[in-house]
A protein has these predicted regions:
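Catalytic machinery of carbohydrate-active enzymes
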Residues: 1-52, 58-393
């Protein structure tokens, strides 16, 4: 079975979608074998709105490809179009039962998101979206996905207009598009409910899953992640990160993480540390997505702790259960906090202006981060250390 998945654009969102991707990989065989409900039987586009799935209200759009060259078949001529009527004429015992290993997934999306899923065992290959640089973006996107060949099913974890064009161009028998909802559920739950509804699943594992092996460090690591791609409002101050690192410089090996666009703030931290006699390793702009995951996963194995803003690396840490101090300011931590990481501690203030959800502080004061002191973070790190020691003992 061959599946196309359009990944979320942002690294953090892609990590949060990993549980839903696992559900697709694991249960696609049953989907191919005809375990569809009558919801999918018509040969036209569907739109299901405001369906309640537990605590989550999710909207899902399902598109049916009526391109003539599909000849009424299910997907890439790999099986019958199993509508409700067709199922009545099929003997279930004759339906092909594919294993998870036979499912091949083509991942489509941003460079960072694609790099994250390169190591997935069901990955056939990844395709980086190159349409943004094209003069006629929609036309380029349509033909880029059109030329990928035929698929049994296509899933999009994005809800933009361009994702609709992508699904329209995809040569797939069944197409499923995620739609945003305004409920307060965690983003992991939203993605998972989308897939559970699409595949008619009652249950699915909600654990995040990445396939990079954690690095083995020779000493406990204090990882600092001062960046946040969304905007400056989410960033704790470089001087604050440096103060925390100086407090623990004799206990941990200090490593600074960041992307190429975050070199300046990482270098500020490095400069403060070296001026105060503390050694550190600045990895800003020097690691691939794979190496980033391996290093963050290795921090927990080393007995270390990861201090981070609300960001993609924070979600990577959650996937590896790395002990984490997560610093929140303008965003809703209930929707994007470290998922299922019992080793994480969320630090935030309770100001009237929170959460503003802005990229830059609209008041110009940035009190949600400015008033979150380094001493508070140091105290929480020590508590987390004691908790980890008690659990291991």
């Amino acid at each position: 079975m061959r599946i196309l998945i359009e990944l979320p654009t942002w690294l953090g969102d892609a990590v949060m979608a990993s549980a839903a991707v696992e559900a697709i990989a694991k249960h696609a065989a049953a989907f191919d074998a005809g375990n569809l409900t009558g919801e999918f039987e018509n040969e036209r586009d569907f739109s299901f709105s405001s369906q309640n799935f537990g605590s989550v209200t999710q909207e899902i759009q399902i598109f049916k490809n009526d391109t003539p060259n599909l000849n009424g078949k299910f997907g890439a001529d790999r099986g019958p179009n199993l509508t409700a009527n067709a199922q009545e004429n099929q003997n279930p015992q004759n339906l092909k039962k594919e294993t998870q290993e036979s499912v091949k997934i083509v991942f489509f999306g941003s460079f960072a998101a694609c790099e994250l899923f390169k190591a997935h065992p069901n990955c056939e290959y990844v395709v980086v979206d190159s349409s943004k640089k094209a003069k006629f973006r929609l036309w380029r996107l349509f033909w880029q996905v059109r030329n990928l060949g035929k698929f049994d099913a296509a899933f999009s974890f994005r809800s933009s207009f361009t994702s609709k064009i992508l699904l329209y161009g995809a040569r797939a028998g069944q197409k499923f598009a995620f739609k945003k909802s305004k409920d307060g559920a965690h983003q992991v739950q939203k993605y998972l409910k989308f897939v559970k509804s699409a595949l008619n699943l009652k249950q699915a594992n909600d654990e995040l899953k990445l396939y990079f092996e954690p690095h083995k460090f020779d000493a406990p690591v204090l990882g600092l992640n001062p960046g946040a791609s969304y905007g400056s409002a989410k960033r704790w101050y470089p001087a604050y990160f440096a103060q925390v690192a100086l407090h623990f410089k004799d206990k941990f090996k200090i490593m600074i993480f960041g992307g190429a666009g975050e070199r300046d703030i990482c270098e500020q931290i490095e400069r403060i540390l070296r001026e105060n006699g503390a050694d550190c390793e600045n990895l800003a702009g020097k690691t691939s997505v794979r190496e980033l995951c391996e290093n963050i996963g290795g921090i927990g194995r080393s007995g270390g702790i990861f201090v981070t803003n609300d960001s993609g690396p924070m979600h990577i840490a959650a996937a590896y259960k790395t002990p984490t101090i997560a610093l929140f300011g303008p965003t809703r931590f209930t929707q994007t906090c470290p998922w299922r990481n019992e080793n994480a501690r969320i630090l935030h203030l309770n100001l009237k202006c929170m959460p503003c959800m802005k990229r830059v502080c609209p008041l110009g004061t940035h009190e949600c981060m400015k008033n979150l002191t380094p001493q508070t973070v140091c105290d929480e790190i020590e508590k987390l250390e004691k908790s980890a020691s008690a659990d291991s003992g």
